[in-house]
Curated annotation (Swiss-Prot):
Localization per Swiss-Prot or TrEMBL: Plastid, Chloroplast
GO biological process terms held by the UniProt record: mitochondrial translation
Keyword Ribonucleoprotein found: yes
Broad class of the protein's primary localization: plastid
One GO CC term, this protein: mitochondrion
HAMAP family noted in UniProt: Ribosomal_bS16
Protein name as annotated: Small ribosomal subunit protein bS16c
Upper taxonomic lineage: Eukaryota, Cryptophyceae, Pyrenomonadales, Geminigeraceae, Guillardia
The family this protein is said to belong to: Belongs to the bacterial ribosomal protein bS16 family.
SUPFAM superfamilies xrefs: Ribosomal protein S16
Length: 76
């Protein structure tokens, strides 16, 4: 099953996250199928490719609870 989830990157104490599509059984920092945007909680900066997210959601990709909350703030 594919999931829409956050992949951590950045420095210690200054984490940033990429919004990616990946299998639910993969590790957090594993290989992603597609990158759809990023989220930086330190600067509250967010960039999401809304069209690709809607396409992936229509294909049956399930977002994690954190991603769902993020999408509710940004998109809907």
């Amino acid at each position: 099953m594919l999931k829409l989830r956050l992949k951590k990157y950045g420095r210690k104490g200054q984490a940033s996250y990429r919004l990616v599509v990946m299998p639910s059984t993969s590790k957090r920092d594993g290989r992603a199928i597609e990158e759809l945007g990023f989220y930086n909680p330190c600067t509250n900066e967010t960039h999401i490719n809304v069209e690709r997210v809607k396409v992936r959601l229509s294909q049956g990709v399930k977002p994690t609870s954190t991603v769902k909350n993020l999408l509710d703030k940004v998109i809907f």
